[in-house]
Amino acid sequence: MKRSLRALTVLLALAVVSAPDSAYAQKVFKIAAIVPVSGPAAAFGLGCQRGLEMAAEDIGVFTVAGEKYKMEVVTYDTVYAPDKTVAAINRAVYNDSVKYGVIIGAGVHPPILPIIRETGFLDFAFAAAGKQVTNPENPTVFRIMASSDQLYQTYAVAIAGKLGAKRIAFLGPNDELGKNDAKAIKAEAEKMKAKGVSFVGDEYYERGARDFGPALLRLIAQKPDIIDTDGSPTGSIALIAKQARELGYNGYFVNSTAVLEAKAISDIAGKAGENIIALRIWANPPTKLYTELAERHQKKYGEAAPGTLWETYGAARWLVDTITRAGTFDTKKVAGALAGSSYANHPFGPASWGGEKAYGIKRQIVIPIPASILKNGKWEPFDVKSGKFD
Protein backbone atom coordinates (compact mmCIF):
# COMPACT_ATOMS: atom_id res chain seq x y z
CA MET A 1 0.00 0.00 0.00
CA LYS A 2 2.78 2.42 0.96
CA ARG A 3 4.55 1.61 -2.30
CA SER A 4 1.36 2.37 -4.23
CA LEU A 5 0.90 5.67 -2.41
CA ARG A 6 4.50 6.65 -3.11
CA ALA A 7 4.05 5.79 -6.79
CA LEU A 8 0.86 7.85 -6.95
CA THR A 9 2.62 10.78 -5.29
CA VAL A 10 5.44 10.60 -7.83
CA LEU A 11 2.97 10.47 -10.72
CA LEU A 12 1.08 13.49 -9.41
CA ALA A 13 4.31 15.41 -9.00
CA LEU A 14 5.35 14.56 -12.54
CA ALA A 15 1.93 15.64 -13.82
CA VAL A 16 2.29 19.00 -12.10
CA VAL A 17 5.83 19.50 -13.42
CA SER A 18 4.85 18.56 -16.97
CA ALA A 19 1.56 20.49 -17.02
CA PRO A 20 1.47 23.14 -19.75
CA ASP A 21 1.54 26.82 -18.86
CA SER A 22 -2.14 27.08 -19.73
CA ALA A 23 -2.97 24.91 -16.73
CA TYR A 24 -1.92 27.80 -14.50
CA ALA A 25 -3.83 30.44 -16.46
CA GLN A 26 -6.37 30.93 -13.70
CA LYS A 27 -7.20 34.50 -14.67
CA VAL A 28 -9.59 35.40 -17.45
CA PHE A 29 -9.53 38.45 -19.71
CA LYS A 30 -13.10 39.01 -20.81
CA ILE A 31 -13.90 40.72 -24.09
CA ALA A 32 -17.48 41.40 -25.12
CA ALA A 33 -19.12 40.86 -28.49
CA ILE A 34 -21.97 43.39 -28.21
CA VAL A 35 -23.40 42.53 -31.58
CA PRO A 36 -26.52 41.23 -33.35
CA VAL A 37 -26.48 37.43 -33.52
CA SER A 38 -30.16 37.25 -34.46
CA GLY A 39 -32.30 39.32 -36.80
CA PRO A 40 -31.45 40.71 -40.27
CA ALA A 41 -27.94 41.85 -39.29
CA ALA A 42 -26.99 38.55 -37.61
CA ALA A 43 -24.29 37.74 -40.17
CA PHE A 44 -22.40 40.89 -39.15
CA GLY A 45 -22.52 39.91 -35.48
CA LEU A 46 -21.61 36.28 -36.02
CA GLY A 47 -18.55 37.38 -37.98
CA CYS A 48 -17.42 39.54 -35.06
CA GLN A 49 -18.13 36.84 -32.49
CA ARG A 50 -16.26 34.18 -34.44
CA GLY A 51 -13.39 36.56 -35.22
CA LEU A 52 -12.92 37.14 -31.49
CA GLU A 53 -13.15 33.42 -30.75
CA MET A 54 -10.57 32.55 -33.40
CA ALA A 55 -8.27 35.26 -32.05
CA ALA A 56 -8.66 33.82 -28.54
CA GLU A 57 -7.67 30.39 -29.85
CA ASP A 58 -4.55 31.77 -31.51
CA ILE A 59 -3.53 34.03 -28.61
CA GLY A 60 -3.72 31.25 -26.04
CA VAL A 61 -2.07 32.21 -22.75
CA PHE A 62 -0.52 35.67 -22.44
CA THR A 63 1.23 37.47 -19.60
CA VAL A 64 0.41 40.89 -18.18
CA ALA A 65 2.41 42.27 -15.24
CA GLY A 66 3.62 38.78 -14.30
CA GLU A 67 0.14 37.20 -14.35
CA LYS A 68 -1.09 34.70 -16.92
CA TYR A 69 -4.40 35.22 -18.73
CA LYS A 70 -6.62 33.64 -21.35
CA MET A 71 -9.12 35.59 -23.41
CA GLU A 72 -12.78 34.71 -23.02
CA VAL A 73 -15.45 35.99 -25.42
CA VAL A 74 -18.81 36.96 -23.89
CA THR A 75 -21.59 37.58 -26.42
CA TYR A 76 -24.56 39.91 -25.90
CA ASP A 77 -27.19 39.86 -28.66
CA THR A 78 -28.33 43.38 -29.58
CA VAL A 79 -30.51 42.49 -32.59
CA TYR A 80 -29.01 45.78 -33.92
CA ALA A 81 -31.45 47.76 -31.74
CA PRO A 82 -30.33 50.82 -29.73
CA ASP A 83 -32.31 49.92 -26.59
CA LYS A 84 -30.99 46.37 -26.54
CA THR A 85 -27.45 47.66 -27.09
CA VAL A 86 -27.80 49.95 -24.07
CA ALA A 87 -29.02 47.00 -21.99
CA ALA A 88 -26.16 44.84 -23.29
CA ILE A 89 -23.35 47.26 -22.44
CA ASN A 90 -24.84 47.90 -19.00
CA ARG A 91 -24.95 44.16 -18.37
CA ALA A 92 -21.40 43.70 -19.65
CA VAL A 93 -19.91 46.53 -17.60
CA TYR A 94 -21.91 46.46 -14.38
CA ASN A 95 -22.87 42.78 -14.07
CA ASP A 96 -19.97 41.00 -15.75
CA SER A 97 -17.11 43.49 -15.13
CA VAL A 98 -16.13 43.58 -18.81
CA LYS A 99 -13.96 46.54 -19.83
CA TYR A 100 -13.32 45.78 -23.51
CA GLY A 101 -15.49 44.81 -26.44
CA VAL A 102 -16.56 45.03 -30.07
CA ILE A 103 -19.82 46.92 -30.63
CA ILE A 104 -21.57 46.87 -34.01
CA GLY A 105 -23.50 49.77 -35.47
CA ALA A 106 -23.26 53.52 -35.94
CA GLY A 107 -27.01 53.70 -35.41
CA VAL A 108 -26.78 52.15 -31.92
CA HIS A 109 -23.82 54.22 -30.72
CA PRO A 110 -25.41 57.56 -29.73
CA PRO A 111 -27.19 56.19 -26.62
CA ILE A 112 -24.22 54.11 -25.44
CA LEU A 113 -21.50 56.76 -25.79
CA PRO A 114 -22.34 58.37 -22.40
CA ILE A 115 -21.91 54.94 -20.76
CA ILE A 116 -18.59 54.42 -22.54
CA ARG A 117 -17.34 57.84 -21.43
CA GLU A 118 -18.48 57.32 -17.85
CA THR A 119 -16.97 53.84 -17.44
CA GLY A 120 -13.91 54.06 -19.70
CA PHE A 121 -15.05 50.97 -21.61
CA LEU A 122 -12.69 50.41 -24.56
CA ASP A 123 -14.95 50.05 -27.56
CA PHE A 124 -13.75 48.57 -30.82
CA ALA A 125 -16.51 50.22 -32.83
CA PHE A 126 -17.57 48.22 -35.85
CA ALA A 127 -19.46 51.27 -37.04
CA ALA A 128 -19.35 53.61 -39.98
CA ALA A 129 -20.52 57.24 -39.61
CA GLY A 130 -17.80 59.76 -38.71
CA LYS A 131 -17.20 62.43 -36.09
CA GLN A 132 -20.38 61.55 -34.21
CA VAL A 133 -18.57 58.42 -32.97
CA THR A 134 -14.89 59.34 -33.31
CA ASN A 135 -13.92 62.54 -31.50
CA PRO A 136 -11.83 63.71 -28.52
CA GLU A 137 -14.77 63.22 -26.15
CA ASN A 138 -14.56 59.46 -26.80
CA PRO A 139 -10.88 58.58 -26.26
CA THR A 140 -11.57 54.88 -25.62
CA VAL A 141 -13.57 54.39 -28.85
CA PHE A 142 -11.49 52.96 -31.72
CA ARG A 143 -13.19 52.43 -35.06
CA ILE A 144 -11.85 49.14 -36.48
CA MET A 145 -13.44 49.49 -39.92
CA ALA A 146 -13.19 52.29 -42.44
CA SER A 147 -15.39 55.24 -41.53
CA SER A 148 -18.01 56.63 -43.87
CA ASP A 149 -15.93 59.76 -44.46
CA GLN A 150 -12.88 57.64 -45.19
CA LEU A 151 -14.78 55.40 -47.61
CA TYR A 152 -16.50 58.20 -49.50
CA GLN A 153 -13.33 60.31 -49.69
CA THR A 154 -11.39 57.29 -50.93
CA TYR A 155 -13.91 55.97 -53.45
CA ALA A 156 -16.79 58.30 -54.42
CA VAL A 157 -14.82 60.28 -56.98
CA ALA A 158 -12.87 57.23 -58.17
CA ILE A 159 -15.98 55.11 -58.80
CA ALA A 160 -17.87 57.89 -60.58
CA GLY A 161 -14.85 58.54 -62.78
CA LYS A 162 -14.27 54.88 -63.58
CA LEU A 163 -17.92 54.34 -64.52
CA GLY A 164 -18.39 57.69 -66.24
CA ALA A 165 -21.33 58.33 -63.89
CA LYS A 166 -22.85 61.82 -63.75
CA ARG A 167 -25.95 61.43 -61.56
CA ILE A 168 -25.75 59.97 -58.04
CA ALA A 169 -28.67 59.12 -55.74
CA PHE A 170 -28.78 57.78 -52.18
CA LEU A 171 -31.03 55.21 -50.48
CA GLY A 172 -30.06 54.40 -46.91
CA PRO A 173 -31.38 53.53 -43.47
CA ASN A 174 -33.32 56.16 -41.57
CA ASP A 175 -30.89 56.41 -38.67
CA GLU A 176 -27.65 58.07 -37.57
CA LEU A 177 -25.66 56.13 -40.16
CA GLY A 178 -27.92 56.94 -43.10
CA LYS A 179 -28.25 60.65 -42.33
CA ASN A 180 -24.50 61.05 -41.78
CA ASP A 181 -23.57 59.15 -44.93
CA ALA A 182 -25.99 61.10 -47.12
CA LYS A 183 -24.17 64.26 -46.05
CA ALA A 184 -20.81 62.62 -46.80
CA ILE A 185 -21.71 61.59 -50.35
CA LYS A 186 -23.35 64.96 -51.06
CA ALA A 187 -20.06 66.62 -50.09
CA GLU A 188 -18.12 64.34 -52.44
CA ALA A 189 -20.57 64.95 -55.29
CA GLU A 190 -20.11 68.69 -54.79
CA LYS A 191 -16.36 68.22 -55.39
CA MET A 192 -17.18 66.73 -58.81
CA LYS A 193 -19.60 69.47 -59.83
CA ALA A 194 -17.13 70.97 -62.30
CA LYS A 195 -17.01 67.58 -64.06
CA GLY A 196 -20.76 67.56 -64.52
CA VAL A 197 -21.51 65.21 -61.61
CA SER A 198 -24.57 66.00 -59.48
CA PHE A 199 -26.37 64.56 -56.47
CA VAL A 200 -29.97 64.01 -57.58
CA GLY A 201 -31.86 62.78 -54.53
CA ASP A 202 -31.90 60.95 -51.21
CA GLU A 203 -34.44 58.58 -49.68
CA TYR A 204 -34.50 56.66 -46.39
CA TYR A 205 -36.07 53.45 -45.14
CA GLU A 206 -36.69 51.91 -41.73
CA ARG A 207 -34.41 48.98 -40.94
CA GLY A 208 -36.18 45.70 -41.58
CA ALA A 209 -38.27 47.19 -44.41
CA ARG A 210 -39.03 44.93 -47.37
CA ASP A 211 -40.91 47.24 -49.74
CA PHE A 212 -38.61 49.85 -51.30
CA GLY A 213 -40.84 50.54 -54.31
CA PRO A 214 -42.11 54.07 -53.49
CA ALA A 215 -38.64 55.36 -52.56
CA LEU A 216 -37.10 53.74 -55.63
CA LEU A 217 -39.74 55.22 -57.93
CA ARG A 218 -38.89 58.70 -56.69
CA LEU A 219 -35.16 58.13 -57.14
CA ILE A 220 -35.39 56.40 -60.52
CA ALA A 221 -37.42 59.35 -61.80
CA GLN A 222 -34.24 61.41 -61.36
CA LYS A 223 -32.39 59.07 -63.78
CA PRO A 224 -29.39 58.23 -61.58
CA ASP A 225 -26.36 56.36 -62.92
CA ILE A 226 -25.48 55.21 -59.39
CA ILE A 227 -27.72 54.51 -56.40
CA ASP A 228 -25.62 54.49 -53.25
CA THR A 229 -27.21 52.12 -50.72
CA ASP A 230 -24.99 53.14 -47.82
CA GLY A 231 -24.68 50.39 -45.17
CA SER A 232 -27.73 48.42 -46.28
CA PRO A 233 -27.20 44.79 -45.20
CA THR A 234 -27.22 41.87 -47.60
CA GLY A 235 -30.94 41.10 -47.38
CA SER A 236 -31.93 44.73 -47.85
CA ILE A 237 -29.70 45.47 -50.84
CA ALA A 238 -30.80 42.24 -52.52
CA LEU A 239 -34.42 43.39 -52.30
CA ILE A 240 -33.50 46.94 -53.35
CA ALA A 241 -31.69 45.63 -56.44
CA LYS A 242 -34.49 43.22 -57.35
CA GLN A 243 -37.22 45.85 -57.00
CA ALA A 244 -35.20 48.56 -58.76
CA ARG A 245 -34.57 46.33 -61.80
CA GLU A 246 -38.29 45.50 -61.93
CA LEU A 247 -38.94 49.25 -62.07
CA GLY A 248 -36.58 49.65 -65.02
CA TYR A 249 -33.34 50.79 -63.35
CA ASN A 250 -30.26 49.65 -65.27
CA GLY A 251 -27.51 51.53 -63.45
CA TYR A 252 -25.07 50.60 -60.72
CA PHE A 253 -25.49 50.20 -56.99
CA VAL A 254 -22.72 51.10 -54.55
CA ASN A 255 -22.69 49.74 -51.01
CA SER A 256 -20.23 51.66 -48.91
CA THR A 257 -20.16 50.42 -45.33
CA ALA A 258 -21.82 47.00 -45.04
CA VAL A 259 -20.07 43.70 -45.74
CA LEU A 260 -22.22 41.84 -48.24
CA GLU A 261 -22.61 38.12 -48.96
CA ALA A 262 -22.60 37.39 -52.71
CA LYS A 263 -24.46 34.07 -52.56
CA ALA A 264 -27.30 35.48 -50.46
CA ILE A 265 -27.72 38.41 -52.85
CA SER A 266 -27.84 36.08 -55.84
CA ASP A 267 -30.29 33.74 -54.10
CA ILE A 268 -32.71 36.63 -53.51
CA ALA A 269 -32.11 38.93 -56.48
CA GLY A 270 -30.75 36.61 -59.16
CA LYS A 271 -29.42 38.54 -62.15
CA ALA A 272 -30.84 41.74 -60.67
CA GLY A 273 -27.94 41.68 -58.22
CA GLU A 274 -25.39 42.21 -60.99
CA ASN A 275 -23.31 45.40 -60.88
CA ILE A 276 -23.44 45.97 -57.14
CA ILE A 277 -20.12 47.55 -56.20
CA ALA A 278 -19.24 46.85 -52.58
CA LEU A 279 -16.44 48.49 -50.63
CA ARG A 280 -14.45 46.58 -47.99
CA ILE A 281 -14.86 43.25 -49.80
CA TRP A 282 -11.84 41.37 -51.12
CA ALA A 283 -12.44 39.43 -54.32
CA ASN A 284 -8.88 38.10 -54.01
CA PRO A 285 -7.25 37.41 -50.61
CA PRO A 286 -4.84 40.22 -49.60
CA THR A 287 -2.70 38.12 -47.23
CA LYS A 288 -1.90 34.51 -46.35
CA LEU A 289 -3.52 35.02 -42.93
CA TYR A 290 -6.76 36.14 -44.61
CA THR A 291 -6.87 32.85 -46.53
CA GLU A 292 -6.02 30.75 -43.48
CA LEU A 293 -8.81 32.31 -41.44
CA ALA A 294 -11.30 31.81 -44.27
CA GLU A 295 -10.34 28.14 -44.55
CA ARG A 296 -10.55 27.58 -40.79
CA HIS A 297 -14.00 29.14 -40.67
CA GLN A 298 -15.21 27.07 -43.61
CA LYS A 299 -13.96 23.87 -41.99
CA LYS A 300 -15.47 24.64 -38.58
CA TYR A 301 -18.84 26.10 -39.61
CA GLY A 302 -19.36 24.63 -43.07
CA GLU A 303 -19.94 28.04 -44.64
CA ALA A 304 -18.01 31.04 -45.94
CA ALA A 305 -16.72 33.45 -43.32
CA PRO A 306 -18.91 36.52 -42.69
CA GLY A 307 -17.20 39.69 -43.89
CA THR A 308 -16.74 41.14 -40.40
CA LEU A 309 -14.55 38.27 -39.20
CA TRP A 310 -11.14 39.49 -40.39
CA GLU A 311 -11.25 43.04 -39.05
CA THR A 312 -12.42 41.80 -35.66
CA TYR A 313 -9.73 39.14 -35.52
CA GLY A 314 -7.03 41.66 -36.39
CA ALA A 315 -8.27 44.15 -33.78
CA ALA A 316 -8.31 41.53 -31.02
CA ARG A 317 -4.76 40.35 -31.77
CA TRP A 318 -3.56 43.96 -31.90
CA LEU A 319 -5.28 44.74 -28.59
CA VAL A 320 -3.73 41.84 -26.69
CA ASP A 321 -0.29 42.67 -28.10
CA THR A 322 -0.75 46.23 -26.82
CA ILE A 323 -2.02 45.16 -23.38
CA THR A 324 0.95 42.80 -23.03
CA ARG A 325 3.42 45.55 -23.89
CA ALA A 326 1.68 48.12 -21.70
CA GLY A 327 1.59 45.72 -18.75
CA THR A 328 -1.88 46.87 -17.69
CA PHE A 329 -5.60 46.42 -18.34
CA ASP A 330 -6.33 50.06 -17.51
CA THR A 331 -8.38 51.06 -20.56
CA LYS A 332 -7.21 54.67 -20.67
CA LYS A 333 -3.53 53.67 -20.52
CA VAL A 334 -4.11 50.95 -23.10
CA ALA A 335 -5.96 53.44 -25.35
CA GLY A 336 -2.95 55.75 -25.32
CA ALA A 337 -0.56 52.92 -26.13
CA LEU A 338 -2.83 51.53 -28.84
CA ALA A 339 -3.24 54.89 -30.59
CA GLY A 340 0.52 55.25 -30.88
CA SER A 341 1.06 51.76 -32.29
CA SER A 342 0.90 50.07 -35.67
CA TYR A 343 0.25 46.43 -36.50
CA ALA A 344 1.91 44.57 -39.34
CA ASN A 345 -0.09 41.34 -39.05
CA HIS A 346 -3.62 42.51 -39.79
CA PRO A 347 -5.42 40.14 -42.22
CA PHE A 348 -5.94 43.07 -44.63
CA GLY A 349 -2.31 44.21 -44.51
CA PRO A 350 -0.33 46.72 -42.40
CA ALA A 351 -2.56 48.75 -40.08
CA SER A 352 -2.20 51.99 -38.13
CA TRP A 353 -4.42 54.72 -36.66
CA GLY A 354 -5.33 58.01 -38.33
CA GLY A 355 -8.08 60.61 -38.35
CA GLU A 356 -6.44 63.23 -36.14
CA LYS A 357 -7.03 66.03 -38.66
CA ALA A 358 -10.57 64.94 -39.54
CA TYR A 359 -11.78 63.90 -36.09
CA GLY A 360 -9.38 65.57 -33.67
CA ILE A 361 -8.04 62.25 -32.39
CA LYS A 362 -6.20 59.20 -33.80
CA ARG A 363 -8.84 56.55 -33.37
CA GLN A 364 -9.66 55.65 -37.00
CA ILE A 365 -8.07 52.50 -38.37
CA VAL A 366 -6.07 52.92 -41.57
CA ILE A 367 -5.86 49.74 -43.63
CA PRO A 368 -6.05 48.89 -47.34
CA ILE A 369 -9.62 49.28 -48.63
CA PRO A 370 -10.84 47.09 -51.49
CA ALA A 371 -13.82 47.45 -53.81
CA SER A 372 -15.42 44.52 -55.62
CA ILE A 373 -18.23 44.21 -58.16
CA LEU A 374 -20.81 41.43 -58.31
CA LYS A 375 -20.73 39.50 -61.59
CA ASN A 376 -22.41 36.15 -62.20
CA GLY A 377 -23.02 35.67 -58.50
CA LYS A 378 -19.38 36.22 -57.49
CA TRP A 379 -17.25 39.16 -56.42
CA GLU A 380 -14.72 40.34 -58.98
CA PRO A 381 -11.93 42.87 -58.26
CA PHE A 382 -12.85 46.49 -58.94
CA ASP A 383 -10.12 48.47 -57.14
CA VAL A 384 -7.87 48.59 -54.04
CA LYS A 385 -6.77 51.80 -52.33
CA SER A 386 -4.55 52.56 -49.34
CA GLY A 387 -7.26 53.96 -47.06
CA LYS A 388 -4.97 56.81 -45.99
CA PHE A 389 -6.93 59.16 -43.74
CA ASP A 390 -5.43 62.12 -41.90
Q: Where are each of the predicted segments found?
A:
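Extracytosolic ligand-binding ectodomains
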Residues: 2-12, 24-390
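N-terminal signal peptide c-region/cleavage motif recognized by signal peptidases
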Residues: 18-20
